A protein has these predicted regions:
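Short alpha-helical segment of the dimerization/phosphotransfer core of two-component systems
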Residues: 15-23
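Short conserved segment of the HATPase_c
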Residues: 130-142
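Conserved glycine-rich
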Residues: 169-171
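Helix-loop junction within the histidine kinase core
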Residues: 34-45
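A conserved beta-strand-to-alpha-helix junction within the catalytic ATP-binding
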Residues: 44-62
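Short helix-loop "hinge" at the ATP-lid/N-box region of the Bergerat-fold HATPase_c
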Residues: 99-100
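Short beta-strand/loop element within the Bergerat-fold HATPase_c
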Residues: 107-117
């Protein structure tokens, strides 16, 4: 059917499809968040190697980064941690998605190291950066940084990431310089 449409109609159909996918993603995120907050979903942390999880996330975002002219690097690690694979993937994917979305040129690095009683996963970018005054607010539900409001999004990705990671006994920190980029450090119990 679509092949019989005039070019302008096909463009409209494509635009409608893209918007419906964004709406579906938003609804899906809100449902996940609600279920997590209301205890309907429980996390099941297991002691697991991080490399396969990080490799999957890097592969998921590699094409999107390349389309934007970005380099995405995953540094090999032999670190293990205690986490729920499905939900930690969701949390880290939200952070990597933001890194790709808010980086216009440069690189995104994903690495993991041992840090005291935690495995620390660093996701660093050369993107827009976040002002010091906003760094404490970015994990608030629906908060959007002033310098990225023209980008698509509703401000629940980092909130959801923090909820997941804290539910696993971990935490997230951010270090950022406006115009230089950000490093999100995710700490998971070993």
């Amino acid at each position: 059917m679509e092949e019989n449409l005039p070019a302008s109609a096909k463009a409209n159909v494509d635009a409608l499809y893209n918007q419906s996918e964004k709406l579906r993603f938003l609804i899906d995120s809100l449902v996940k968040l609600s279920r997590l907050e209301n205890g309907i979903i429980s996390l099941s942390p297991q002691h697991t190697a991080l490399q396969p999880l990080l490799q999957g996330i890097a592969e998921q975002y590699s094409a999107k980064a390349t389309e934007k002219g970005l380099s995405l690097y995953l540094h090999d690690t032999d670190i293990s941690a205690t986490f729920d694979s499905k939900w930690t993937t969701e949390a880290l994917a939200n952070i990597v998605d933001n890194a790709v979305k808010y980086t216009e040129h440069g690189t995104i690095n994903i690495s993991a190291v041992s840090y005291e009683m935690f495995a620390r996963i660093d996701i660093s970018d050369t993107g827009a950066g976040i002002s010091e005054s906003e760094q404490s607010k970015i994990f608030t539900r629906f908060y959007r940084s002033k310098n990225v409001r023209e980008q698509e999004g509703v401000g629940i990705g980092l909130y959801l990431a923090r909820q997941i990671i804290s539910g696993e006994g971990g935490y997230i920190k951010v270090a950022s310089v406006p115009g230089k980029g950000s490093t999100f450090s995710v700490f998971l119990p070993k």
